[in-house]
Structures are given as structure tokens and as C-alpha cells.
């Protein structure tokens, strides 16, 4: 009687990538611990290091952090298997790497993130964006490599391989990743950020739960479980930290051509205590509307202080989203911008903002002016048109630069590119004087006794651009000091100039990029 021959269902290398998956997960956890330690060592403010790489490490720059992360992942990528004889092992390993990294990528976007509480959401966003591109690229190459392998193998049919149920699911994920990479390019994002965001949301959810069905051996434990928990925390936060509110008042100056408006919301949309310069996100949809989950909410900076009667927003209106009095809006999140620790450790502060950057500069200027006794405080606001000044009630102490003359003819070379800042450059893109006076007029048309007249600015400059070395000469010390802080907010070109100035003079800086 002939003996039966047992044939293995899978080859000897079927489980070759299990260990690498755990290694990738461990590296991801290690990276989170590294982020935690980098900020914990900064118990006090220090001058920005003249060693660029060290400063990039502290700041969490993806230009340095991503290569370091990938280097550690590459160390164990090539094992004892021959790349030529066991190419499928490394193709599968690339796919597993792509999926396991989803845990880290989703973790970086948690709001609030209680573990990385020393980072703001915006500080972690660049790493999330570049890690997303790396994950998508790994997944695309994983699928492409198998298509090429099957096409070159005369012993298998490409069609039969692709339309095998498990491989078909992988093929669907491959198409989704290609679409995500295409829509994440700068051209597409600038044309339709909403389209990019919707593709991002749908793909993230689909890939998280299709890959576990496709992958062999499975990835459900622990990866899919942890990813599902993080996605659940995202959903819970969007439900728990959401409240409905209507606009109390809208101050505009359309008659004079300004698109800058000031919005007043009820005070209860923010907690009793919050750090000046904090941010909120606003959605025009209710939580029960699917678009609430698929369409991006709009980020804005709180232009008021905790002691004020209302929560103020200063923004530039555009066709995509406009506040109106009457409709109710969903206030989705509030989160810190500059940290309270940074504000408490400085004695000399200069604030330079452009356009809607006033929404960050104004509350910080008021905070230092009204609640602290620092040795030096200066604020500069650059606007394109004199009509934009209507959003402020009090100009006292603010130096203003109007880059267009009174005939609204642009000054040659006066920052024409400032209108071209794309939304995704920084997620916090903060999108008639007669109306302001009406609140203070009696029935006869006379000003009521309680009316406060606008105070004069520190200086106003028409048709002249900011000269950093001149305007900030009194701020600069011969040697950098940890108690100096330059806050710069506005168009990318303004922020870039401010960062360069701070770097040249070894000054601690805080930056945010808004549209002009």
C-alpha cells in the first residue's frame, strides 16, 4: 500500500513576514516615545539651536523624522531570504509595512492627543502628511510588483490571479491608493481640497478594513484592532466635542471692497479657560448629516480672550464657506496653538502678522498687554487694503502697513503672490464701519455715551513694505535669549521672512501660515 504524501498548503516562507510586522509596530511605538521625550526635555524655553538638524529634530520636521523612521524600518527589511529566489517575500513585506504604519499615521492625527499633549495638532500634521504619502507609495509598489511578477510568470495567468477573491480585494486597495496619491498632489489639492479630503476619508476607512480580509497571513491581531480603536476614538471625539451654535453678529465692510469679516459666536462654544491664540473647527453640517463626516470642517483662530463676552473670529470670506446670521453651525473641536508654557516664559515679544493673521496676533497682543508685565511688546499688522482695518475696534499700540495705496492700485512688487497660498499649506487657513457704529447709535442718530472710539494706531504706513531690520531693530539683542519670542503669522512669504529673521538673530519664534 502506497503511503500518502502530504503537501503543504503554503510554502516555507508563508509566515516569513510575521516577525517584521511586529518589528514595524514596535518601531512605531518607539517613534511615539521619541516624540514624547523630545518635548519633555524642553521643560524651559531655549534659544533656537544654530544646528539646523538638531532644531529640525526638536520641531518634528518630516524632512528629518521620516528618513530616520524609514531607516529603522529598513534595518530589518532584508532578511536571510534571497531577493531573487524569494521576491514574493519582500513584495508581501512591503504590503505589511504599509498597513502596519497606518497605526502610527492615525495616532498622529488624534484630537485631543493626551499622550503627545506637548504638541499641537498642527505641529504633528506635516509628519502625518508625508507618512501618508510613504504608506501609499509602499502599497502601490506592493501591488505593482505582484502584477509584474504574475505577468512575467509563464506558469500562472495574470487574469486568474487578479480575479481571485482575495487578490481582487488587494487590487481594489491598489486602485484606491493610486487615486489617493493622485488627489494628494498639490495641483489637485489647490483646485479642490474638498475632493481630496473626501477621497482621503473614504480611502482611510476602506483600506483599514479591506486589507485584513486580503492579507495572508492575517493582520487582524494586533494591527486591525488597534487601528479600529484609534478610528473609534476619532469618531467619539467628533461626537463628544461637538456643539451646535449660531452667529451672534457679523461685522463686514463689503461696500469698500473688504472681504475681511469679524464673527461673534456665543461665549459657551469655548471652555471657561483656554490659551490665547487657540483654534476651533466649524462645520456647516449637523452630526447626523453624512457630509459632517466626509467634508472637511473649517479651522479658525479665536481672536478674543477668555474674559470677553463673545468668541470672536476674524477671517477672509471666500466662495467655499461663509458665515451667516441665522443658520446653526457645528463647533467640532477646539485646540491649543501656541502653548501656555511658551507664553509664560518670555519677557520680550514682537508679533508680526499679515491679513487674517490678525486673528492670532490680536489676542496674544492683548494677553501680553493686559495680563502680563513683560519688558518689551511690539505688534505689526500688514494688510493689503485700508478697508480691512474695520475689523478692529482698538488700534492702540499696533503698527500698521497698508501695501496698497488709496486708489487700490497694487504697489509694484508688493507681495502679489500672497493670494496664492493653498489651503493645505497649513490646515488652519482662516478663511462697514457703518454697521459697527449702528450698535452704538441712539434713536436720534447720536452716539451713545458708552461708545468707545477707535484709538489711533502706533503708526500707519501706506504703500510701504515691512523692513524687518528697521522695524525690529529695538527688539534684537546682540545675543539671542530664551526670554525673547517672535510670533509671525500670515501668508507664507511673510512667515518665511520672519523665520529667517529669527534664525539670523537666534530668536525663539512661533509661526502659523494663513492666507492673506
Swiss-Prot record:
Keywords: Electron transport, FAD, Flavoprotein, Ion transport, Membrane, NADP, Oxidoreductase, Transmembrane, Transmembrane helix, Transport. One of its GO terms (biological process) is reductive iron assimilation. Disulfide bonds: none annotated. One of its GO terms (molecular function) is superoxide-generating NAD(P)H oxidase activity. CDD domains: NOX_Duox_like_FAD_NADP. Residues 238-363 form the FAD-binding FR-type domain. The chain crosses the membrane at residues 18-38, 64-84, 97-117, 128-148, 168-188, 195-215, 217-237. Pfam families: FAD_binding_8, Ferric_reduct, NAD_binding_6. It is found in: Membrane. It is a multi-pass membrane protein. GO terms for cellular component: perinuclear endoplasmic reticulum; plasma membrane. Belongs to the ferric reductase (FRE) family. AIM14 subfamily. This is Probable metalloreductase AIM14. It comes from Eremothecium gossypii (strain ATCC 10895 / CBS 109.51 / FGSC 9923 / NRRL Y-1056). The lineage of its organism: Eukaryota, Fungi, Dikarya, Ascomycota, Saccharomycotina.
